[in-house]
């Protein structure tokens, strides 16, 4: 069993602090309870997150509950909408991620996870 899934960032400082403590990879999925496209990939994302090795930290963030972090990343053109998953490699302590997935294409989602995990 991997690390517990993070479900909330109080603010962007807490988010950036998590990057400094990156165990190997960090995946952050941004979505919302009301988001229909988010629901389309929810099971696939959960399956991937639950099968991660111990050096991968995952977060499932509701944009309505972590608005500071989402708005900050959106202002930097990191996220354009939801669902979006961003990936940070160990050593990247900057807000710009190493890889990004946005949308609902399940094949592209699987390729995104494979591509990121190949960097471990």
Regions of interest found by a model, annotated:
Residues 17-19, 70-77:
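Short amphipathic alpha-helix with an adjacent loop that forms part of the alpha/beta core around
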Residues 1-26, 59, 107-120:
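N-terminal leader/targeting and pre-domain segments
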Residues 6-10, 30, 42, 46-70:
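Thiol-based oxidoreductase modules, predominantly thioredoxin-like and allied folds used
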Residues 36-37, 67-69, 94, 108-110:
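Eukaryotic short linear interaction motifs
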Residues 15, 27-28, 58, 85-87, ...:
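Structural signal for hydrophobic/aromatic residues that build the beta-strand cores
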Residues 31, 61-64, 88-90, 104:
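Structured beta-strand/turn binding interfaces of compact recognition modules in eukaryotic regulators
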Residues 80-120:
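Non-catalytic, surface beta->alpha helical segment in thiol-disulfide oxidoreductase systems
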Residues 14-50:
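Local sequence-structure signature of Cys/Sec-based thiol-disulfide redox active-site neighborhoods
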């Amino acid at each position: 069993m991997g690390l517990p899934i993070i479900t909330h960032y109080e603010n962007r400082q807490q988010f950036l602090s998590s990057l400094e403590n990156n165990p190997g990879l960090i995946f952050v999925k941004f979505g919302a309870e009301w988001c229909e496209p988010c629901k389309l990939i929810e099971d696939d994302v959960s399956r991937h997150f639950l099968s991660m090795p111990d050096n991968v930290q995952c977060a499932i963030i509701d944009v309505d509950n972590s608005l500071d972090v989402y708005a900050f990343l959106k202002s930097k053109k990191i996220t354009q909408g939801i669902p979006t998953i961003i990936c940070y490699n160990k050593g990247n302590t900057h807000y710009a991620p190493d890889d990004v997935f946005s949308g609902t294409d399940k094949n592209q989602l699987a390729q995104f996870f494979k591509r990121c995990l190949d960097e471990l």
